[in-house]
Design a protein with these regions (language model features):
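C-terminal regulatory/interaction module of P-loop NTP-utilizing enzymes
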Residues: 1-163
Length: 163
């Protein structure tokens, strides 16, 4: 499985090595899910599919996101899965938060390159259509009122085109 090594690493990062006397008394220790449970929860939420899609789009745009995006998403899914139900966001709000805060910011790096390409070529770069397609896909998944759509609108306003 593509995401298994990342899930193992994310859980290793979150695992506490021990509680020291200097730690905050209010520190809450959560029972973290196992690798299979983490991947199952990420899949149930649709985030593994979103990650695969985002990695594909990043590749087409020439962006190198590295493993940090995947690790960030899997870490927050692990915490979400471990949290008591009284502290959990609803699934749709949580997914919108993850996409808008942990996935889409990686795509901001495309704006300067697209602006430079537009100036040098005096025409609209193909990346603009890819970003528009991203906005459409996110709108289908998360709805027109989602925070993720607003992030995409902001990214489109950074590009040298009519939105």
């Amino acid at each position: 499985d593509l995401f298994r090594p990342y899930a193992e690493r994310a859980l290793r990062y979150l695992a506490m090595r021990g509680v020291l006397e200097e730690d905050l008394a209010t520190l809450v220790v959560l029972g973290l899910p196992g690798v299979e449970e983490l991947l199952g929860e990420a899949d149930r939420l649709g985030l593994l599919g979103v990650l695969e899609w985002a990695l594909g789009v990043a590749d087409r745009l020439g962006l190198e996101v590295g493993p940090s995006m995947v690790l960030d998403v899997l870490r927050v899914v692990a915490v979400h899965a471990a949290a008591p139900s009284s502290l959990r966001l609803s699934d749709d709000v949580f997914v919108d938060y993850v996409v808008s805060s942990l996935i889409l910011p990686y795509f901001a790096a495309v704006a300067p390159r697209v602006r430079q390409k537009a100036v040098l070529s005096a025409r609209q770069p193909r990346e603009v259509n890819e970003v528009r397609d991203m906005r459409e896909k996110i709108g289908e998944w998360l709805g027109a009122q989602s925070l993720s759509i607003r992030v995409m609108e902001g990214l489109l306003h950074e590009l040298p085109v009519e939105v």
